[in-house]
Amino acid sequence: MKMSGLLSKPDYGVVGIVFTVVFCCWCSSSTTHALSIAEPGRDRYDKRSPTGHGVEVVESGEDYGSNRPQPVYGDEDEEDSADVYVGSDESSSGEKTRLTAAKRRLRFNKRRLRASKRRLRFHKRRVDSADESNDDGFDRKAREPRLRFHDVRKRSATAEEGSENAEIEESHLGNSRSRRSAGSAPSSANEVQRSKRLSITNDLRAIADSYLYDQHKLRERQEENLRRRFLELGKRGSAFFDHIPIIFGEPQYDYQPFK
Protein backbone atom coordinates (compact mmCIF):
# COMPACT_ATOMS: atom_id res chain seq x y z
CA MET A 1 0.00 0.00 0.00
CA LYS A 2 2.83 2.38 0.81
CA MET A 3 4.56 1.72 -2.51
CA SER A 4 1.34 2.25 -4.40
CA GLY A 5 0.84 5.54 -2.56
CA LEU A 6 4.33 6.75 -3.48
CA LEU A 7 3.99 5.86 -7.16
CA SER A 8 0.45 7.11 -7.59
CA LYS A 9 0.94 10.93 -7.79
CA PRO A 10 4.20 12.88 -7.37
CA ASP A 11 4.22 16.28 -5.72
CA TYR A 12 4.88 18.67 -8.65
CA GLY A 13 5.59 21.61 -6.39
CA VAL A 14 8.48 19.87 -4.66
CA VAL A 15 9.85 18.65 -7.97
CA GLY A 16 9.72 22.19 -9.40
CA ILE A 17 11.53 23.65 -6.40
CA VAL A 18 14.27 21.02 -6.65
CA PHE A 19 14.80 21.66 -10.37
CA THR A 20 14.85 25.44 -9.79
CA VAL A 21 17.56 25.11 -7.15
CA VAL A 22 19.64 22.84 -9.41
CA PHE A 23 19.28 25.25 -12.34
CA CYS A 24 20.34 28.26 -10.23
CA CYS A 25 23.41 26.39 -8.99
CA TRP A 26 24.37 25.46 -12.54
CA CYS A 27 23.97 29.05 -13.78
CA SER A 28 26.11 30.45 -10.97
CA SER A 29 28.86 27.90 -11.54
CA SER A 30 28.93 28.55 -15.31
CA THR A 31 29.07 32.32 -14.73
CA THR A 32 31.97 31.96 -12.30
CA HIS A 33 33.81 29.73 -14.74
CA ALA A 34 33.32 32.17 -17.60
CA LEU A 35 34.58 35.10 -15.53
CA SER A 36 37.65 33.15 -14.43
CA ILE A 37 38.44 32.38 -18.07
CA ALA A 38 37.88 35.99 -19.22
CA GLU A 39 40.11 37.64 -16.61
CA PRO A 40 43.50 36.51 -18.06
CA GLY A 41 42.38 37.53 -21.53
CA ARG A 42 41.42 41.03 -20.37
CA ASP A 43 44.73 41.44 -18.57
CA ARG A 44 46.58 40.42 -21.70
CA TYR A 45 44.51 42.87 -23.78
CA ASP A 46 45.26 45.71 -21.35
CA LYS A 47 48.96 44.95 -21.56
CA ARG A 48 49.12 44.57 -25.35
CA SER A 49 46.76 47.39 -26.36
CA PRO A 50 48.15 50.91 -26.89
CA THR A 51 46.72 53.17 -24.21
CA GLY A 52 46.60 56.91 -23.73
CA HIS A 53 45.82 58.14 -27.21
CA GLY A 54 43.03 60.44 -26.09
CA VAL A 55 43.10 63.88 -24.50
CA GLU A 56 42.39 64.14 -20.80
CA VAL A 57 39.99 66.89 -19.73
CA VAL A 58 40.87 68.83 -16.55
CA GLU A 59 37.88 70.43 -14.82
CA SER A 60 39.49 72.20 -11.87
CA GLY A 61 42.86 73.01 -10.38
CA GLU A 62 42.44 70.45 -7.59
CA ASP A 63 43.04 67.64 -10.04
CA TYR A 64 46.70 68.60 -10.40
CA GLY A 65 48.50 66.19 -8.13
CA SER A 66 51.07 63.44 -8.01
CA ASN A 67 48.48 60.67 -8.39
CA ARG A 68 46.80 62.26 -11.41
CA PRO A 69 47.62 60.44 -14.69
CA GLN A 70 49.51 62.51 -17.23
CA PRO A 71 47.63 63.38 -20.42
CA VAL A 72 48.92 61.93 -23.65
CA TYR A 73 47.86 63.71 -26.83
CA GLY A 74 47.03 61.76 -29.94
CA ASP A 75 46.58 62.83 -33.53
CA GLU A 76 44.71 66.04 -34.24
CA ASP A 77 42.49 64.48 -36.90
CA GLU A 78 40.99 61.95 -34.48
CA GLU A 79 37.94 64.00 -33.62
CA ASP A 80 35.54 61.08 -33.42
CA SER A 81 37.65 59.01 -31.02
CA ALA A 82 36.64 58.75 -27.36
CA ASP A 83 38.69 60.26 -24.53
CA VAL A 84 40.68 57.63 -22.65
CA TYR A 85 42.18 58.11 -19.20
CA VAL A 86 45.46 56.30 -18.75
CA GLY A 87 45.16 53.70 -16.05
CA SER A 88 41.37 53.98 -15.67
CA ASP A 89 38.85 51.15 -15.82
CA GLU A 90 37.23 52.60 -18.94
CA SER A 91 40.44 52.35 -20.97
CA SER A 92 39.44 49.13 -22.72
CA SER A 93 36.05 50.42 -23.92
CA GLY A 94 37.55 53.77 -24.97
CA GLU A 95 40.34 51.99 -26.82
CA LYS A 96 37.84 49.82 -28.66
CA THR A 97 35.88 52.92 -29.66
CA ARG A 98 39.03 54.68 -30.85
CA LEU A 99 40.17 51.68 -32.90
CA THR A 100 36.72 51.31 -34.45
CA ALA A 101 36.70 54.99 -35.43
CA ALA A 102 40.19 54.72 -36.90
CA LYS A 103 39.22 51.69 -38.97
CA ARG A 104 36.12 53.48 -40.23
CA ARG A 105 38.16 56.53 -41.17
CA LEU A 106 40.72 54.44 -43.04
CA ARG A 107 37.98 52.61 -44.91
CA PHE A 108 36.33 55.88 -45.90
CA ASN A 109 39.63 57.33 -47.10
CA LYS A 110 40.28 54.23 -49.22
CA ARG A 111 36.82 54.51 -50.71
CA ARG A 112 37.38 58.14 -51.69
CA LEU A 113 40.76 57.22 -53.17
CA ARG A 114 39.20 54.47 -55.24
CA ALA A 115 36.50 56.84 -56.46
CA SER A 116 39.06 59.45 -57.49
CA LYS A 117 41.21 56.92 -59.36
CA ARG A 118 38.34 55.23 -61.14
CA ARG A 119 38.75 55.04 -64.89
CA LEU A 120 36.62 53.68 -67.70
CA ARG A 121 38.04 50.31 -68.68
CA PHE A 122 37.24 48.28 -71.74
CA HIS A 123 37.70 44.59 -71.07
CA LYS A 124 38.91 42.62 -74.06
CA ARG A 125 38.59 38.89 -74.39
CA ARG A 126 42.02 37.63 -75.36
CA VAL A 127 42.15 34.05 -76.65
CA ASP A 128 45.39 32.35 -77.60
CA SER A 129 45.65 31.21 -81.19
CA ALA A 130 47.70 28.41 -82.69
CA ASP A 131 49.07 30.26 -85.68
CA GLU A 132 49.34 33.91 -84.60
CA SER A 133 49.93 35.91 -81.45
CA ASN A 134 46.82 37.58 -80.06
CA ASP A 135 48.08 41.13 -79.63
CA ASP A 136 45.08 42.97 -81.02
CA GLY A 137 42.49 41.53 -78.61
CA PHE A 138 40.39 39.98 -81.36
CA ASP A 139 38.17 37.11 -80.29
CA ARG A 140 39.53 34.06 -82.10
CA LYS A 141 36.67 31.82 -80.95
CA ALA A 142 34.32 33.71 -83.26
CA ARG A 143 36.03 31.89 -86.14
CA GLU A 144 35.27 28.35 -85.09
CA PRO A 145 35.28 26.79 -88.62
CA ARG A 146 38.97 27.62 -89.08
CA LEU A 147 39.87 24.88 -86.62
CA ARG A 148 38.93 22.28 -89.22
CA PHE A 149 41.58 23.33 -91.72
CA HIS A 150 44.69 21.72 -90.31
CA ASP A 151 46.80 22.29 -93.41
CA VAL A 152 46.30 26.07 -93.26
CA ARG A 153 47.18 26.15 -89.60
CA LYS A 154 50.21 23.97 -90.17
CA ARG A 155 51.47 26.21 -92.96
CA SER A 156 51.08 29.36 -90.89
CA ALA A 157 52.62 27.72 -87.81
CA THR A 158 55.63 26.49 -89.78
CA ALA A 159 56.08 29.95 -91.30
CA GLU A 160 56.11 31.55 -87.86
CA GLU A 161 58.51 28.91 -86.53
CA GLY A 162 60.84 29.60 -89.43
CA SER A 163 60.79 33.34 -88.75
CA GLU A 164 61.45 32.74 -85.04
CA ASN A 165 64.37 30.43 -85.82
CA ALA A 166 65.81 33.04 -88.17
CA GLU A 167 65.55 35.70 -85.49
CA ILE A 168 67.29 33.42 -82.96
CA GLU A 169 70.11 32.69 -85.37
CA GLU A 170 70.54 36.39 -86.07
CA SER A 171 70.64 37.16 -82.36
CA HIS A 172 73.45 34.62 -81.86
CA LEU A 173 75.53 36.21 -84.60
CA GLY A 174 76.81 39.27 -82.77
CA ASN A 175 79.39 40.35 -85.33
CA SER A 176 77.05 40.17 -88.27
CA ARG A 177 74.36 41.94 -86.28
CA SER A 178 76.74 44.81 -85.55
CA ARG A 179 77.54 45.09 -89.25
CA ARG A 180 73.89 45.15 -90.29
CA SER A 181 72.20 48.41 -91.10
CA ALA A 182 69.81 50.18 -88.74
CA GLY A 183 66.77 49.44 -90.91
CA SER A 184 66.92 45.66 -90.49
CA ALA A 185 64.75 45.59 -87.34
CA PRO A 186 61.76 47.33 -88.96
CA SER A 187 62.03 45.01 -91.95
CA SER A 188 61.79 41.94 -89.70
CA ALA A 189 58.76 43.46 -87.96
CA ASN A 190 57.17 44.07 -91.36
CA GLU A 191 57.83 40.46 -92.32
CA VAL A 192 56.09 39.26 -89.17
CA GLN A 193 53.10 41.50 -89.82
CA ARG A 194 52.95 40.34 -93.44
CA SER A 195 52.98 36.70 -92.39
CA LYS A 196 50.18 37.37 -89.93
CA ARG A 197 48.09 39.06 -92.60
CA LEU A 198 48.70 36.17 -94.97
CA SER A 199 47.63 33.64 -92.35
CA ILE A 200 44.46 35.60 -91.64
CA THR A 201 43.72 35.83 -95.36
CA ASN A 202 44.22 32.09 -95.77
CA ASP A 203 41.91 31.46 -92.84
CA LEU A 204 39.20 33.66 -94.32
CA ARG A 205 39.50 31.94 -97.68
CA ALA A 206 39.24 28.54 -96.02
CA ILE A 207 36.16 29.68 -94.09
CA ALA A 208 34.49 30.95 -97.26
CA ASP A 209 35.41 27.71 -99.03
CA SER A 210 33.85 25.64 -96.27
CA TYR A 211 30.71 27.78 -96.32
CA LEU A 212 30.28 27.33 -100.07
CA TYR A 213 30.92 23.61 -99.75
CA ASP A 214 28.30 23.29 -97.00
CA GLN A 215 25.78 25.23 -99.05
CA HIS A 216 26.46 23.02 -102.06
CA LYS A 217 25.96 19.86 -100.01
CA LEU A 218 22.78 21.23 -98.46
CA ARG A 219 21.38 22.06 -101.89
CA GLU A 220 22.19 18.55 -103.13
CA ARG A 221 20.41 17.02 -100.15
CA GLN A 222 17.35 19.19 -100.76
CA GLU A 223 17.23 18.16 -104.42
CA GLU A 224 17.57 14.52 -103.47
CA ASN A 225 14.70 14.83 -101.01
CA LEU A 226 12.55 16.45 -103.67
CA ARG A 227 13.31 13.67 -106.16
CA ARG A 228 12.48 11.02 -103.57
CA ARG A 229 9.18 12.67 -102.70
CA PHE A 230 8.15 12.97 -106.35
CA LEU A 231 9.12 9.35 -106.99
CA GLU A 232 6.96 8.28 -104.07
CA LEU A 233 4.03 10.19 -105.58
CA GLY A 234 4.39 8.22 -108.80
CA LYS A 235 5.75 10.91 -111.07
CA ARG A 236 8.68 9.23 -112.74
CA GLY A 237 10.83 10.95 -115.32
CA SER A 238 14.44 11.94 -115.54
CA ALA A 239 13.98 15.06 -117.68
CA PHE A 240 11.48 16.62 -115.28
CA PHE A 241 13.55 16.04 -112.15
CA ASP A 242 16.67 17.62 -113.64
CA HIS A 243 14.88 21.00 -113.79
CA ILE A 244 13.29 20.92 -110.34
CA PRO A 245 15.54 23.65 -108.80
CA ILE A 246 14.69 26.00 -111.68
CA ILE A 247 10.96 25.38 -111.26
CA PHE A 248 11.05 26.18 -107.56
CA GLY A 249 13.09 29.33 -108.08
CA GLU A 250 16.42 27.99 -106.81
CA PRO A 251 19.23 28.90 -109.21
CA GLN A 252 21.94 26.32 -109.71
CA TYR A 253 25.42 27.34 -108.55
CA ASP A 254 28.55 25.55 -109.55
CA TYR A 255 30.84 24.93 -106.62
CA GLN A 256 34.08 26.77 -107.32
CA PRO A 257 36.42 26.98 -104.34
CA PHE A 258 38.91 29.81 -103.90
CA LYS A 259 42.28 29.34 -105.50
Swiss-Prot record:
Signal sequence residues: 1-34
Cellular component GO terms held in the UniProt record: extracellular region
Modified residues (Leucine amide): L233
Region described as Disordered: spans on this chain: 42-103, 149-197
Sequence repeat ranges per the UniProt record: 119-123, 146-150
Localization, UniProt: Secreted
GO biological process, one term: neuropeptide signaling pathway
Annotated family: Belongs to the molluscan ELH family.
Official protein name in the record: Ovulation prohormone
Organism: Lymnaea stagnalis (Great pond snail)
Lineage: Eukaryota, Metazoa, Spiralia, Lophotrochozoa, Mollusca
